[in-house]
């Protein structure tokens, strides 16, 4: 199978080690899921628990994920009690009001970017060092197709999710040699309070089944899809089996990543 894009290697050219998952209390692996009291986060938390994970749930409240002191205290308390964190699912997030960029309120616009970028960054910054110390772990960032293209009516959300993809890539690069893997998960359009309240989805009759999301999270958490570290996977289009087969066939260096191809004269090539 191919190595993920920009895989760090050691001085002898060997690929970095696979993450170690030994488990926390009672030998069960430990997951932290933000925004887990409802919607996608709740589905993910329940699926992980059914699969034998110990799940630490973050609420949907905005303040905690953007409050550095609160995040660091919560993570430290989890590690003190459980001994380790094997999986972080950055799910908590908000969308901006669906208005034209030129009519947007600057405070509302920035709040969306702050929650959807600063929140995952603070969680990643607090959790990943513990993963490194324990021999590895996995980070799943709940992203969206909005990261792939600009939006006039949801500009803050699009900007934030593009930035989140860069955070995933940075986590991959910083953590790979330490056994840490990071993924962007596009959940499709799951029927939740948030999506039902969006004008963009008014009248929608077809929704992504939550099980398609949770199946991918469980596969990513298990290590079966580690070749996809730094890349996007999409519920409703991908399955664990299809992703494994694609990786076995060989992934392109920039496949499913955000890369601007400038050609041979690219100054950063």
Where on the chain are the PLM-derived regions?
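The beta1-alpha1 cofactor-binding region of Rossmann-like NAD(H)/NADP(H)-dependent oxidoreductases
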Residues: 62-73, 106
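Catalytic Tyr-X3-Lys loop
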Residues: 102-121, 136, 140, 164
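Conserved mid-core segment of classical short-chain dehydrogenase/reductases
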Residues: 72, 95-110, 153-156
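Active-site helix of classical SDR
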Residues: 124, 160
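Active-site-adjacent segment of SDR/Rossmann-fold oxidoreductases
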Residues: 149, 170-180, 224
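Conserved glycine-rich cofactor-binding loop
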Residues: 37-38
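C-terminal helical subdomain
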Residues: 184, 202-269
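Residue(s) in the substrate-gating loop at a strand-loop-helix junction
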Residues: 144
């Amino acid at each position: 199978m191919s190595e993920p894009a920009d895989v760090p290697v050691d001085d002898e050219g060997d690929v970095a080690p696979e993450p170690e998952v030994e488990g926390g209390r009672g030998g069960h692996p430990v997951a932290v899921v933000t925004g887990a009291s409802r919607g996608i986060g709740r589905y993910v938390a329940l699926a992980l628990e059914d699969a034998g994970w110990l799940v630490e749930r973050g609420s949907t409240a905005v303040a905690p994920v953007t409050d550095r002191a609160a995040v660091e205290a919560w993570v430290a308390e989890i590690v003190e009690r459980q001994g380790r964190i094997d999986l972080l699912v950055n799910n908590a997030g908000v969308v901006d009001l669906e208005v034209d960029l030129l009519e947007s309120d600057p405070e509302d616009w920035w709040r969306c970017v702050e929650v959807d970028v600063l929140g995952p960054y603070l969680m990643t910054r607090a959790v990943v060092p513990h993963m490194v110390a324990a021999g590895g772990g996995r980070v799943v960032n709940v992203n969206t197709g909005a990261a792939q293209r600009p939006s006039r009516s949801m500009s803050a959300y699009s900007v934030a999710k593009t930035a989140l993809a860069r955070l995933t890539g940075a986590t991959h690069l910083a953590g790979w040699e330490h056994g840490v893997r990071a993924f962007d998960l596009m959940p499709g359009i799951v029927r939740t309070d948030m999506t039902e309240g969006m004008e963009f989805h008014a009248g929608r009759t077809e929704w992504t089944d939550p099980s398609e999301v949770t199946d991918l999270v469980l596969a990513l958490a298990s290590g079966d899809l580690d070749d996809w570290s730094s890349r996007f996977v999409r519920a409703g289009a991908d399955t664990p089996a299809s992703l494994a087969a694609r990786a076995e066939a060989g992934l392109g260096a920039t496949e499913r990543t955000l890369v601007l191809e400038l050609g041979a004269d690219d100054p950063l090539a």
